A protein has these predicted regions:
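Short intrinsically disordered, low-complexity coil segments enriched in acidic
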Residues: 1-5, 160, 236-240
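N-terminal secretory targeting signals
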Residues: 1-74
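Proteins with a high burden of low-complexity, intrinsically disordered sequence enriched in S/T/G/P/A and R
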Residues: 40-41, 112, 147, 240
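Extracytoplasmic
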Residues: 213-240
Length: 240
């Protein structure tokens, strides 16, 4: 039968939506939460997620923002429409992007659909390399397949590492080559301090980005592919 999934990635959207009243404030809130709760050194990221996801849904007073370690943490809040910086700390400091890597993985997938290279119904095969990725994952097995729409939902809802690799291999042949493609796309978007080497964000010392670069990517995801933006509000999906 089909299995229902509800995952940790959806809290970014839910938390943003709770304090938003209009398009401008909504996207600003979404960017604020993405860039202040998720772009930390790897050891702090998961703990910060657990802490923030259970806080009361009250408006944030940015004047009182206190980060755990100002020397390590990075934060950037921008107006999602104008790009104006509202709050910044270590915005250009290099950090490991962790699962925010998947923002670029999906950007590449959305771009392939816009170009007509794939559709939501395109079926992508699962390799052994994809199947052996560490959790979180959809626990796909080598030889299985997944269509593009389920892959998008698995990445957004579950932050599925195996599915991110399936996308990478389908679009780039190998995950290594896809990392090069992602880095090239980052340069085209103006993300000059970002280097990708995998599609999932699993630990790799060479994979780095900045809060500033990820803000650029977040805006491009919204404005380059508005037809797919609704996927970011997905709170669950069923996969067989």
């Amino acid at each position: 039968g089909r299995k229902p999934f509800r995952g940790w990635f959806m809290w970014l959207w839910q938390r943003a939506k709770s304090g938003a009243t209009a398009g401008r404030s909504f996207f600003t809130a979404a960017l604020a939460l993405v860039l202040t709760t998720a772009l930390f050194v790897p050891q702090a990221a998961e703990a910060r997620h657990r802490a923030t996801s259970h806080r009361a849904k009250a408006p944030v007073n940015w004047a009182n923002v206190s980060l755990t370690d100002p020397k390590k943490d990075a934060a950037l809040i921008i107006d999602g429409v104008s790009g104006r910086v509202l709050y910044a700390r270590n915005a250009h400091a290099l950090r490991h992007p962790a699962s925010l890597t998947k923002m670029m993985t999906l950007y590449m997938l959305f771009e392939s659909m816009k170009r007509g290279q794939t559709t939501l119904q395109t079926v992508m095969p699962v390799s052994e390399h994809a199947a052996i990725q560490h959790p979180t994952k959809l626990y796909l097995r080598a030889g299985q397949s997944i269509d593009v729409e389920d892959a998008i939902k698995a990445v957004v809802v579950l932050s599925a590492n195996d599915v991110a690799v399936v996308i990478a291999e389908y679009l780039g042949g190998t995950e290594d080559h896809f990392g090069e493609m992602m880095t090239q796309k980052a340069r085209q978007l103006g993300m000059n301090d970002t280097f990708y080497h995998n599609a999932s964000g699993l630990p790799d010392d060479r994979q780095i980005s900045t809060a500033s670069d990820l803000a650029i990517l977040a805006r491009h995801l919204a404005y380059d592919f508005p037809q797919y933006f609704h996927y970011w509000s997905t709170t669950g999906f069923t996969y067989h």
